[in-house]
Structure formats: C-alpha cells, structure tokens
Amino acid sequence: MPLFATPFAQLDLVRQPEQDGEPLQAFDAADEYLLNQLHERGVTAQCRVLVLNDAFGALAASLAPHVQVTSSGDSHLGFLALRKNLARNGLDLGSVRFVPASETAVGPFDHVLVKVPKTLALLEEQLIRLHGQLAPGAQVVAAGMVKHLPRAAGDLLERYIGPMHASLAVKKARLLIAEAAERPQPRSPYPTRYRLEQPPLTLLNHANVFCREGLDIGTRAFLPHLPRSLGALRAADLGCGNGVLGIAYALLNPQAELTLVDESYMAVQSARENWRAALGERPATFRADDGLAGQAAGSLDLVLCNPPFHQQQVVGDFLAWRMFLQARDALAAGGELWIVGNRHLGYHAKLKRLFRGVEQVAANPKFVILKAGK
C-alpha cells in the first residue's frame, strides 16, 4: 500500500477491520485536500484542531505531532483504526483525544476538519454540537469525494456555522469552507422516535442510527419469528442498532441475559435508552465494540443478527462474514445464530461453511430468516 504523504507526515495506514489482500486504501484524496488546505492556512503547536469522522485516523494521526488534536466520530472501528495507525507509525496513543459522537467535544477549537458522513443527520447533529465550541475566527472545512458530496452538506454548514463557499475539485475531491459567524443556539431535531405496534414500543433513535425514521424491513420480517420461552439463556443482539431485536427478545424471554453490541456509539446509546424505557431496571450489557471481538469464547447461547452489508461507501458481505465468525467463536456448543438477510446475499451457503447445521425459519419474497447451530 502507498504511504499517505502530506506536508504534515508520511504515514503507513491500514483500514479496520483489516482484510487479507485488502485492495482499498485507508485514506482518500479528500483527506489529502483537507490537510493541504490546513497547511496553507498555517498552524502552530498551540492550535486546537477538531477532526470529525476520520474513518481510519489519517487526519488525526497526520496532525498529532504538530497541533492539539481531538478526534470525534460515531464508529468504534474508526477509534480502533486510529489507535492502530498511531501505534503503527510510532506515535503516542495519548497524542489524540477521542470523543464518541454520542458526546460533545469540548473546545474551543481553532480549526475543524470534517469528513462528510454518509448519513447527513450525523453531520447535522455534529454541526449543532459545535455551537459554543468554536474560537473567534475559527474555520470549519468539510470534505468529500465529489460523487459522495451532496449539496445539502453545504446548506447545513451555512445554517449552523456561517458563510460557506465550495472549492474547486482536486483529484475528484472538494472542500466546503465555512467561516464561523454568530448563529442563534440551534435546537437539535435528534433523537427521533417512532412507534412500533408489535411489540408495542416507542423507539428512540439518535442521529446516526440506521433507519431512524422507522423500522427497517429486514427487522420487521425477523420480529415475528424470534425464539421465545427459552429460559435463562445468554443472548446477544449483534449490530443492535436501536436495540429493537434484543428488547423484543427480552420481552419474550423474561429470564434471558442480554448483551447489546454495535460499533456505533449512537446506536448503543439509543439501545440503552430504549431498553430502560421498555424494561426498566432489568440488567443488560451495552457495549460499543468490534462486533463480538471482545466476547469470551463459548460465553453465549444465542446470537441475533441483522447484518449490515456496507461500511461507509463500500458495499459487500465482508462485515457479515466477520460477524458470523465472531458469533461462532462466542457461542457455546449447541448455541445458535439467528439472522435475517436479503435472499440474494446467499447467507445460507456461507453459514454452512461455519456451522454444523443451518435451517430456514421463515422467508418472504425479499428476506430469509436462518438459524445456524454450533
């Protein structure tokens, strides 16, 4: 892989999770453009720089030896990538302060560098949280590859930060540059809520939660087929989102011990709040993690999963395959993985390579629900 070379550093960077024969780089031309623009603007060791949505740590790691860096994002995988890439390049792990997107990064900041996320609601919430955290004369610069950079991103910068102009495109990347100006204290439209009829739940969703406006159709297909009356099993909702699968299963299985895990901090926060609203003080474990990587081997009896099929702009089944491997390792002998997936993804064949038996629980023209036994 080529080095990431900018006026600040030359770094050897990897993606997270790493894949054998990985063809994709851990940086893009938008990262390079952001750092070149900041270098031209000029920084000193006293400059306080906030980096938002730094997918694999390219921005924060480049800046760490030169300025005071805070990095904030909603991906725990992104946090792990940052730590890995700092260590890989001989940089102090403490040189970058990390703040999950579920919390507010406290300034004041002189410069804010933003990689525009796929979910514009996340960008909106992040810009709202910048209110009161910018130093006088601060600049907020957002960047993305032109094909992934919606006009609405510039509108959000205008609304919440100040006058904005777009740069020329360089290597198919573009900057949106906003000068901080007086703006009234904004009121966030997040979290959102929607009502579920069965089970009867009102579900809260922070800004970056998948399908925050309503239940996704895969989960809707899965809910009527959740196993019930299984006793005191140790179960996990893997990739829990707002927690609906884990909560619905817990309602059907009052003695079950639940762990809800997601790589999104906002998802875990949503799941925790929804659990409390539905189940009060009933104990459960909530964890932002790289799937079940932190789960002890053989410590679960059941895993429920509606696996994702994309990481940022990259589509594929590599994340689902990784979750299936993690579930197999975390399950005790006789344990089961239950999943829902699009028919065309062929999960049945993949699961057969990992588990002793795979059965179809239910299906409709679009989705299939499978259970795989260890």
Swiss-Prot record:
UniProt keyword annotations, A-Z: Cytoplasm, Methyltransferase, rRNA processing, S-adenosyl-L-methionine, Transferase
Its job: Specifically methylates the guanine in position 1835 (m2G1835) of 23S rRNA.
One Pfam family, short name: MTS
Annotated localization: Cytoplasm
Protein name stated in the entry: Ribosomal RNA large subunit methyltransferase G
Catalyzed reactions: guanosine(1835) in 23S rRNA + S-adenosyl-L-methionine = N(2)-methylguanosine(1835) in 23S rRNA + S-adenosyl-L-homocysteine + H(+)
Broad EC category: transferase
Principal subcellular localization: cytoplasm
Biological source species: Pseudomonas aeruginosa (strain UCBPP-PA14)
InterPro entries: DNA_methylase_N6_adenine_CS, rRNA_m2G-MeTrfase_RlmG, RsmC/RlmG, SAM-dependent_MTases_sf, Small_mtfrase_dom
Similarity field: Belongs to the methyltransferase superfamily. RlmG family.
